[in-house]
Structures are given as structure tokens and as C-alpha cells.
Amino acid sequence: MKVILCLGGNPARLDTAITLLQSTPDSTLIVSSESPVETVLGKLNDAGIDPLRYIIDETAWDTVTNFTNTVPLVKKLGTTELLVVTDGFHMLRAMCVGAFVYFKSGVKLHPHPSSPHDHSESWSLVLLDTARAALYRFTNQTLYDQTVYNDRIAIFYNDYYRGRQVSTRMSP
């Protein structure tokens, strides 16, 4: 089974993730985003995606936490392949972060840009987030206060269950 990890809920990224999901019947989509759950659900429901084929994670607030916060979900799904969806300009940073977070996990990352790679992010940002991912890999810390994480994980579970209820009501 493949897992598609969509970093953020912007329309182009979601469109790419939905296309991948539709073309890969044995896959599950994880949307890791701060976008309102209703916006993401609307896009998924409009595309006719079965609610059992996706998980929405609203606990991440940056690239590092997009990966670190979804590790337990990816492990639970038992995948060996993670298809990473983000903008082309963001892909280098995403793949560097993902490589550290999933180092020696048996999960292979595959880039799937939602837009052309027409420019890159600053090297300082790539290096900073890669260093934070390395720190996470060896210490399980992301340089964020634990209380912030605890607050966000509670929101995630509330929104996850609310999202399931909303998607059930919105299904035809």
C-alpha cells in the first residue's frame, strides 16, 4: 500500500494528491494542513473520494511537523512508499526533511510536485528545517514547546472526528 502525503491544503496540491489517489487504488491520502477541515473535505467530497481513503491532520504548522506529526499514521498504515505532494519550489526542502524523519524506517519517499520547479526556497530555510528534522530524528524534538503540541494534538483529534462526521453528512 502507498500513502500519499499532501503538505498543505492549497488547491493545486490537493488536485495533485486527488489525481494520485484516484490513479492508485490501493493508496491512502494524508492531508497535513492548517487549512480549515471543511475546505479540504469539500475538495475531497467534490472529487468523490471515499472518506475511508483519507485522513486529515491539522496538527502540523510547518514542513517539519507535516512529516513528524504524521509518522504514527504512516507507521499504522504499514506503508513502505510515501508519495510526497507539494509545490515544485518547496520540494527540495520537503524531501530533505522527509529523508531525515524517515531515515532507516523502511519508508521510501517519492516526490510528486503540484507545480513546476521554477525557483527554489532559500538555502537558509532548507538548512534550518533539515537541521530541525535531524534533531527530531535523534531526539524526537522539533524545537517547539510541548504545550503547543499538546494543544494542537487535541485539536487534531477533535477535527478528525468532526471531519468524519462532516464527510459522512456531505456524502451523496
Q: Residue locations for each model-derived region?
A:
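A transmembrane-helix-recognition feature enriched in membrane-embedded lipid enzymes
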Residues: 122-146
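Short, charged low-complexity intrinsically disordered segments located at boundaries
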Residues: 71, 123-131, 160-168
